[in-house]
Amino acid sequence: MVSLLWKFTLLCLFLLACTSAEVLERSSKPQTPDKDPFYDPPSGWEEKEHGTILRSRKVDIAFFQIAKVKYKEAYEILYRTSRSEEDQPSTTVTTVIVPENAKKDKLVNMNVYVDSNGARCAPSYVLQRNAKLATDPALSYQQVLFSTILDEGYILTVPDYQGPKRAFAAGRLEGHMAIDGILATLNLKELCLSKDTKVIGYGYSGGSIATGWAASLQPSYAPNLNMVGWTFGGTPANLTSTLEHLNGGTPAGFAVSGVAGIVDEYESVADWINDKLTHKGKHALDFVREHCTVGIVLRYPFTNILSDSFMKHGAQLLQSPIMKKVLGTLNMGVRPDETPKAPVYMFHAKLDEVIPYGSAHDAAKRWGDHGADILFEEFTGLVMGHASTELLNLPNVLLFMRDRMSGKPFIHGYEHKHTDNPLEDPGVIAKGFDALAETIKNAIDNTVGMGDKHMKAKIEQSRRRRIVS
């Protein structure tokens, strides 16, 4: 769940500014996951252990950003995993990217924000060379971050953590699939990775759902993983409050996507809601199942999912016993036995206009009360909107990764830090991030900030054009 239209604008600016960049060589067109037989598991897969590789292949990766990014090799892995419950077997795919200067004992699980339900939005498809142009500009934009992490020498594993049904916002499913993507990557013999490989998980916005739940579930689900840290921000830690916050607002399309994801993962919810949806509601869920973020946000701004036009007795959507039971299991930090064991760096803008700050802070505090070592950084500056925060805070994320990978000590217990703007932190310059900070400033100058006002303005313009037409 993220403000996206300004990111599309930013991506276009990148492309216009880099017309001299290397042109990617053409190769065969990849197929979307719903049409590619690679994604169909072989017989007997249900009996395998989670994290087991079912098949793998080499792929060509193209980063649709400033310039072609060099990498040594890339693979896709189909692996056995679990849905929301461990006894619900499923499969999904992760994309593994190995940099030229790969450090064979360091791995980053990068849970990119997909925030949509369409098959062609899956990272394993979008990341491939010659995937449909700009099928998901949001993911294409986030690949700007990939190059920075790859430059550190860290191998990346990027899972399709929403699974074959693309169950966006089904946090427990996403957590399991992210963890099993790590296990599958460690099991890929071509990489020669040790079981003691140091692993860090990262995610922002919709990607932080997968990362936050992976951090919560890993100690019991895959306790032997050598997790040395988790870092995530803009976190929808409480799905109920997030849906209520999104509802009726500019990014309301993400609420529609979230409802579709929950319906598609939980049969009890599907059985309850399907005969209550209006024609408009059914059409909305069908639409998001076929489209990616930009199309969804443009199609459903200001939509009220709690209205009678969406479903009969719409106000009951989030308050019915069935929905409350399911949504109650999707709140981070509630159960003491689901507390991250590895160090956590969590960050959130105080003025985040998309994801409620309070819910994220509450989850972090509860984790701390349950024994987690967690630094929660609150950004108070007026330029810190939901979308701008991820990019502006990239230096601190990289610093956290470097320190965890090198074994430096971390805080004990819970600590709350207040910062105006991360790029104004003297530590960013002192740690050698001055060049990266300048690049970030130049990239977002006059494009984001002030509550991501540009994103809101563009959606309002789109809405007016639709009314006129």
From Swiss-Prot:
Glycans are attached at residue 238. Keywords: Disulfide bond, Glycoprotein, Hydrolase, Lipid degradation, Lipid metabolism, Secreted, Signal, Virulence. Its main location: secreted. The keyword Phosphoprotein does not apply. Belongs to the AB hydrolase superfamily. Lipase family. Class Lip subfamily. GO terms for biological process: lipid catabolic process. Pfam families: LIP. Disulfide bonds join 121-292. Its EC number is 3.1.1.-, 3.1.1.3. The keyword Lipid metabolism applies. Residues 1-21 form the signal peptide. The active site is at residues 205, 352, 386. Secreted lipase that hydrolyzes acylglycerol lipids such as triacylglycerols and consequently releases free fatty acid. Generates free oleic acid from the substrates mono- and diolein and hydrolyzes triolein in significant amounts. Due to an absence of fatty acid synthase genes in Malassezia species, secretory lipases are essential for the yeast to generate free fatty acids from degradation of sebum and assimilate them as lipid sources for growth. Plays an essential role at the pathogen-host interface during disease progression. It comes from Malassezia restricta (strain ATCC 96810 / NBRC 103918 / CBS 7877). GO terms for cellular component: extracellular region. It is found in: Secreted. It catalyses: a triacylglycerol + H2O = a diacylglycerol + a fatty acid + H(+); a monoacylglycerol + H2O = glycerol + a fatty acid + H(+); a diacylglycerol + H2O = a monoacylglycerol + a fatty acid + H(+). GO terms for molecular function: triacylglycerol lipase activity. This is Secreted triacylglycerol lipase LIP3.
